[in-house]
Amino acid sequence: MIENEKNKDSYRAQFPHTENGHIYLNHAAISPLSRKVTTALRDYLDNRSFGSVEDFETWMQTVDETRNLIARFIHTNHPERVTFMGNTSDAISAVAEGLSWNDGDEIILNSMEFPSNVQPFRILERFGVKLIYLIPDDEGRILPNQIKKAITEKTRLVSISAVQYLNGFRADLKSIGEICNQYNLLFVVDGIQGLGAADIDVTTCRIDALATGAHKWLMAPMGIGFLYISEKLMKQLSPAKTGWLSVEVPWDLTNFDQPWLPVSKHLETGTLNISGIFGLNVSLKNFFDIGTDTVQNEIGKLVDFTIERLQDEPSVKIITPMQPQDRAGIITFSVNGMDSPDDFVNSLKSNGITISAREGYIRISPHYYNTTDEIETVLNLIFSS
């Protein structure tokens, strides 16, 4: 057991599933909701059902507060550049479809990406846009110099996941951002496997668009996420969608010829996911109460422990990068002789243990409240199967 891990009782008390022996190590897919989050959701729903029902003033205060919390979380002094979105795909699509493209323009991606960071750009091929897929090195990494070498006079944009969903590789966003700035390229980051497990500083990293859903490491409800847009990108982006809230005075209902809002607000076209925003609000406050550094350090300790334990097993092949700076919260590996990782994962789930199988590999993704004892239990089951 990691030193001071016994102090996790207060963390674990927030997650009821830990009380019935359920071991949950699949936060790269979806996270459990804390008691604080479910209480906030219940209060909101109770008010809709039994209370004042319509409470727009309180709701809008929570929306504004949550926007400020997000800005603080990603290190920007510009909450007005944060747009609420339903998911990562919506957010990346807003960027891809909001830019003007020319025949022959190039976008640099990589072959490891989750489809959310590919399909919104692939549809641009109808305009003659060319997608350049970089191949990871032998350690499963896409390094900044590789991106630099792929840049041509036709390159317009680089998009990469902060952390790759399969092998858990964590990109050097700061160095990539510097390269994009040097060549005047737009820099887009899919943050869903990073935010909550690793720090992402949009200012230091010169990120033009940070897109994410919040149901994974951010531990919020499904169907809520956000898009951060830099000043540079705002000047180039035209809204890909429009609604009644996209104008300066939306409640001037009969005045159709109104000025449009800036693009970041323009994209919030209609009724927001208020319940999701309430949940995200409380979850972000919990991160700040615990300390974002503390959360990331706890995850790092668990990942280090898991990798060290796996390295003792000759039947294991780890595809997660070995250097701590190259990973965040995901550990992915194969086990020689395991016929079907999917069947094995399903058998564990029927016994109250949740991990995941992806592309023929086992993937474990612990959060700050998990313990080494839980990980040891899972690994013992894997190696005794």
Annotate each predicted stretch with a short phrase.
Residues 1-385:
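Pyridoxal 5′-phosphate
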